[in-house]
């Protein structure tokens, strides 16, 4: 029985021609034309190689018949033991754009007849379906198959059973073929300088591509599992970090939301507007004075406001966003005004002659209703009663006394107008 490992006669399949920088750009017809040029040392050798091709085909078919009749197959060997069987010339037809190497012109050893014809018709091919195709390894497949396709015969030869894949396409029914079969593509090229930066992402994967497709090496499987576990652990750690970051972001957002809710609560805004109005009245400051005094706070982006804006804030007729924006500004002014008022009360005045005209006093509605109730009971209260009312309503005694005087004058005018 003829083995694929046996030494076969050395055939010079085609003359050694200088390859171009980009051989994949030249068509097969151009290659045939160059092969048939009338060069004196090569012209006589061309037809001799064709005769040798036919003889090799006959020998290969005979080997297939012997293998089928005996029904035996060689023990499976890794692809690395048949390194010299796959030594095809290294051209730049690889799928990864690498630097242009100096081509090593190896003579083709133990190539099948279909591969020889295909190589003569298209010399720009570098990687063909030699072992996964037809002939001695294919188990009765057609000897001439288009490039990049597996042989139709299934696994009859030695080491068969893997998918005959060449280049980037899969054959219609391709068997695994002979000892050098399996995956034959750009990544399984025997020359080490072709394994560049883009073929495979991991050495274990690259070694798995060089193995026959039927049975991967256990060491490669273990290496791939180890690196897969490491990648899974790294992904889990990254997921934990991302989850922690997301949790921190959620906690921070919740804290900001709780802070902002206290400022944007409508009930809180309403209570502040009422407190601001009462304290402004106690200070004896008008709404127009508040609006003009805001420019003195030196707050960036804040100038003087109109009296109508302060009035709308106190009556809660501003928009919600404007109320939120105006609240800290008015609160800052109120604290500064009350601080100035306390300092003024603590300092004794040197003389009262230079005092300006007293401003008009405004009384809030609740206090006004209480005063009207006291006036209905006693229009002319005593000095002690006026002091008690002022202390109860948190007003000045003079303000309460003047209000009672004004209210009596108002009632007198109303009676006079009703009589006449």
From Swiss-Prot:
The keyword Cytoplasm applies. Transmembrane segments: none annotated. Keywords: Cytoplasm, Developmental protein, DNA-binding, Homeobox, Nucleus, Transcription, Transcription regulation. Residues 261-338 form the POU-specific domain. InterPro entries: HD (IPR001356), Homeobox_CS (IPR017970), Homeodomain-like_sf (IPR009057), Lambda_DNA-bd_dom_sf (IPR010982), POU (IPR013847), POU_dom (IPR000327), POU_domain_TF (IPR050255). GO terms for molecular function: chromatin binding; DNA binding; DNA-binding transcription activator activity, RNA polymerase II-specific; DNA-binding transcription factor activity; DNA-binding transcription factor activity, RNA polymerase II-specific; DNA-binding transcription repressor activity, RNA polymerase II-specific; GTPase binding; RNA polymerase II cis-regulatory region sequence-specific DNA binding. Residues 132-165, 172-184 have a biased composition (Gly residues). A motif (POU-IV box) lies at residues 57-66. Residues 99-108 have a biased composition (Basic residues). Disulfide bonds: none annotated. Residues 94-117, 132-200 are annotated as: Disordered. Detected in brain, spinal cord and dorsal root ganglion. Isoform 2 is detected in brain, spinal cord, dorsal root ganglion and spleen. Its main location: nucleus. GO terms for biological process: cell migration in hindbrain; cellular response to cytokine stimulus; cellular response to estradiol stimulus; central nervous system neuron differentiation; habenula development; heart development; innervation; intrinsic apoptotic signaling pathway by p53 class mediator. GO terms for cellular component: chromatin; cytoplasm; neuron projection; nucleus; RNA polymerase II transcription regulator complex. It is found in: Nucleus; Cytoplasm. Belongs to the POU transcription factor family. Class-4 subfamily. Interacts (via N-terminus) with RIT2; the interaction controls POU4F1 transactivation activity on some neuronal target genes. Isoform 1 interacts with POU4F2; this interaction inhibits both POU4F1 DNA-binding and transcriptional activities. Isoform 1 interacts (C-terminus) with ESR1 (via DNA-binding domain); this interaction decreases the estrogen receptor ESR1 transcriptional activity in a DNA- and ligand 17-beta-estradiol-independent manner. Multifunctional transcription factor with different regions mediating its different effects. Acts by binding (via its C-terminal domain) to sequences related to the consensus octamer motif 5'-ATGCAAAT-3' in the regulatory regions of its target genes. Regulates the expression of specific genes involved in differentiation and survival within a subset of neuronal lineages. It has been shown that activation of some of these genes requires its N-terminal domain, maybe through a neuronal-specific cofactor. PANTHER family: POU DOMAIN (PTHR11636), POU DOMAIN, CLASS 4, TRANSCRIPTION FACTOR 1 (PTHR11636:SF42). The C-terminal domain is able to act as both DNA-binding domain and a transcriptional activator. The N-terminal domain is also required for transactivation activity on some target genes acting as a discrete activation domain. Neurite outgrowth and expression of genes required for synapse formation are primarily dependent on the C-terminal domain, however the N-terminal domain is required for maximal induction. This is POU domain, class 4, transcription factor 1. The gene is Pou4f1.
């Amino acid at each position: 029985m003829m083995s694929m490992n046996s030494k076969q006669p050395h055939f010079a399949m085609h003359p050694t021609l200088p390859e171009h920088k980009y051989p994949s750009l030249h068509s097969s017809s151009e290659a045939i034309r160059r092969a048939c040029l009338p060069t004196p040392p090569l012209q006589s050798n061309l037809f001799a190689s064709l005769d040798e091709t036919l003889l090799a085909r006959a020998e290969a078919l005979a080997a297939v018949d012997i293998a089928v009749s005996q029904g035996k197959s060689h023990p499976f060997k890794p692809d690395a033991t048949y390194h010299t069987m796959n030594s095809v010339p290294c051209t730049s037809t690889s799928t990864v754009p690498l630097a242009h190497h100096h081509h090593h012109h190896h003579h083709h050893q133990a190539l099948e007849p279909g591969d020889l014809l295909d190589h003569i018709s298209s010399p720009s091919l570098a990687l063909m379906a030699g072992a996964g195709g037809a002939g001695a390894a294919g188990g009765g497949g057609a000897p001439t198959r288009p490039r990049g396709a597996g042989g139709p015969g299934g696994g009859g030869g030695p080491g068969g059973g893997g998918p005959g894949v060449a280049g980037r396409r899969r054959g219609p029914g391709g068997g695994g073929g002979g000892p050098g079969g399996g995956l034959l593509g750009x990544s399984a090229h025997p020359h080490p300088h072709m394994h560049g930066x883009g073929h495979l992402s991991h050495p274990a994967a690259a070694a798995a591509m060089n193995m026959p497709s039927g049975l991967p090496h256990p060491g490669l499987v273990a290496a791939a599992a180890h690196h897969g576990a490491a990648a899974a652990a790294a992904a889990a750690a990254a997921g934990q970090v991302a989850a922690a970051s997301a949790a921190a972001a959620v906690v921070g957002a919740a804290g900001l939301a709780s802070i902002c809710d206290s400022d944007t609560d409508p009930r809180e805004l309403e209570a502040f507007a009422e407190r601001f109005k009462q304290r402004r009245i106690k200070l004896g400051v008008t709404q127009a004075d508040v609006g003009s005094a805001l420019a003195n706070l030196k707050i960036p982006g804040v100038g003087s406001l109109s009296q109508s804006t302060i009035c709308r804030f106190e009556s809660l007729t501003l928009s919600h966003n404007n109320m939120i924006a105006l609240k800290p500004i008015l609160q800052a002014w109120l604290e500064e005004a009350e601080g100035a008022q306390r300092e003024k009360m603590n300092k004794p005045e040197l003389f009262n002659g230079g005092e300006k005209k007293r401003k008009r006093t405004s009384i809030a509605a609740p206090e006004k209703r209480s005063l009207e109730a006291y006036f209905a009971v006693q229009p002319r209260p005593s000095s002690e009663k006026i002091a008690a009312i002022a202390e109860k309503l948190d007003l000045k005694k003079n303000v309460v006394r003047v209000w009672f005087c004004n209210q009596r004058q108002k009632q007198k005018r109303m009676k006079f107008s009703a009589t006449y």
